[in-house]
Design a protein with these regions (language model features):
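A short, charged, amphipathic alpha-helix used as a generic interaction element across diverse proteins
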Residues: 47-57
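A short, conserved structural fragment
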Residues: 55-65
Length: 85
């Protein structure tokens, strides 16, 4: 599966334990997303368009209204990267 650079960055952070918090309008549509790393930092690569592409490909999911996290398919499709610590 072809994944863009921004999608890859977001998916990698989600696979390491990050989450995507979302805000909904009154009609139920998501209008704002913020991606947090597991350390609590905000990832600027996570835009609404990147979020919708990951959601359409079923690489992320949410359970019971909780923040979005990487799905098992998303964890399998993310390429290995060196974690810079």
């Amino acid at each position: 599966m072809n994944i863009s650079k921004h999608e890859q960055r977001v998916l990698h952070e989600l696979a390491l334990g990050g989450s995507i918090h979302h805000e909904r309008l009154e009609n139920g549509k998501i209008h704002d997303v913020t991606c947090y790393t597991r350390e609590g930092h905000v990832l600027t690569d996570c835009t609404l368009s990147v979020f919708t592409r990951l959601l359409k490909r079923r690489l992320i999911r949410s359970k019971n209204g909780a923040p979005y996290r990487a799905s098992p398919l998303g964890i399998k499709s993310v390429r290995a990267q060196m974690n810079q610590r």
